[in-house]
C-alpha cells in the first residue's frame, strides 16, 4: 500500500461515473487528491462536487473516448449492463447486451494513442473460471435469469483486456451492497449465499490498485469483506 505522503495526484478517467460504484470512485478519488474526469451519458442526472470535470457522451460513440482520454493516466471503469428493475434478476435489460465488451474494445483501440496503459474495471465474482467458487444456488440463479447476460458481457470484457497488452485488472466483487466503508476488504476464494461487499469498499480497493506503481500480476481477483453477516441482518438488508 502506498503511504499517504508518498501518493502523487493522478489524472483519472471514470467510466460509469453516475452508477453506484462509479459515484464512490469519483468521491473517494477526489478525497484522495486525484484529478477526476467523469464520462456520463447526456441524459443521466449527475451533480458531482466542485473540481470534477464532466464530459457528456456515449462511451461507444465515435470520438467520445478520444476526448475523454486526453491527458489522463489511468482509466477506472464501473460500466456494466443495467436491468430495468435492478433488484429483479429476471427484469429486462436496459443496456446493450455487450456494453462492457464493446467499451473494452473501444478502450483497447483508443488508449495507446493517448499514452494510457492502465485500466482497472469492475467485473463480478463468478465470471470465467471463478464460477467454480460460487455457491450452487447462485450458479443456478445466474444461469436461469438475465444476470447471465451480464456475466457473458463481463467475461467478454475480460477476454478483450487479456489480449490487449495493456496493464489491466478486472476486480470480481461478491454481492454488492449499499453501506459505508468497512476497510476490511480481502481477496476471497468462495462466493457464498451471504458473501457481500459494499460499493464503497469496491471503489476504495480499485483506487488503491490504481495507485500501485508496479504492474498488475493478479488480473482477476475476487474480493469480499471479512467476517460474515448474520442470517437475520442479511435477509433484512435493504436492496442495493
Locate the predicted segments by residue.
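N-terminal Rossmann NAD(P)H-binding glycine-rich loop of SDR-like oxidoreductase domains
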Residues: 10-32
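Core catalytic loop region at the nicotinamide-binding pocket of NAD(P)H-dependent oxidoreductases
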Residues: 209-233
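Conserved SDR Rossmann-fold cofactor-binding beta-strand/turn motif
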Residues: 40, 123, 172-175
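NAD(P)H-binding glycine-rich loop region in Rossmannoid oxidoreductase-like domains
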Residues: 5, 44-102, 106, 110-113, ...
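Glycine/proline-rich active-site loop of Rossmann-fold NAD(P)-dependent oxidoreductases
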Residues: 129-131, 180-184, 209-218
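Conserved beta-loop-beta element that borders a ligand/cofactor-binding pocket
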Residues: 158-180
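Substrate-positioning beta->alpha
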Residues: 99-100, 153, 171, 197-208, ...
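Conserved Rossmann-fold NAD(P)-dependent oxidoreductase catalytic core, especially the SDR/UDP-sugar
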Residues: 37, 91-96, 102-149, 163
Amino acid at each position: 500500500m502506498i503511504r499517504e505522503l508518498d501518493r502523487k495526484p493522478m489524472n483519472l478517467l471514470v467510466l460509469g461515473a453516475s452508477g453506484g460504484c462509479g459515484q464512490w470512485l469519483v468521491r473517494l478519488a477526489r478525497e484522495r487528491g486525484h484529478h477526476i474526469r467523469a464520462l456520463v451519458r447526456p441524459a443521466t442526472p449527475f451533480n458531482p462536487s466542485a473540481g470534477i470535470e464532466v464530459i457528456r457522451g456515449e462511451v461507444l460513440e465515435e470520438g467520445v473516448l478520444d476526448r475523454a482520454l486526453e491527458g489522463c493516466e489511468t482509466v477506472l471503469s464501473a460500466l456494466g449492463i443495467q436491468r430495468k428493475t435492478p433488484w429483479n434478476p429476471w427484469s429486462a435489460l436496459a443496456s446493450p447486451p455487450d456494453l462492457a465488451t464493446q467499451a473494452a474494445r473501444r478502450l483497447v483501440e483508443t488508449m495507446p494513442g493517448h499514452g494510457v496503459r492502465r485500466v482497472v474495471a469492475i467485473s463480478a465474482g463468478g465470471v470465467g473460471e471463478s464460477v467454480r467458487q460460487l455457491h450452487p444456488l447462485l450458479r443456478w440463479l445466474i444461469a436461469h435469469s438475465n444476470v447471465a447476460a451480464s456475466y457473458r458481457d463481463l467475461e467478454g470484457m475480460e477476454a478483450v483486456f487479456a489480449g490487449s497488452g495493456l496493464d489491466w485488472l478486472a476486480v470480481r466483487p461478491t454481492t454488492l451492497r449499499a453501506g459505508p466503508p468497512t476497510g476490511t476488504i480481502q481477496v476471497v476464494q468462495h462466493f457464498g449465499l451471504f458473501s457481500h461487499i459494499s460499493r464503497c469498499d469496491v471503489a476504495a480497493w480499485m483506487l488503491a490498485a490504481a495507485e500501485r506503481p508496479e504492474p498488475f500480476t493478479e488480473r482477476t481477483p475476487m474480493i469480499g469483506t471479512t467476517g460474515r453477516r448474520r442470517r437475520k441482518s442479511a435477509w433484512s438488508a435493504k436492496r442495493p
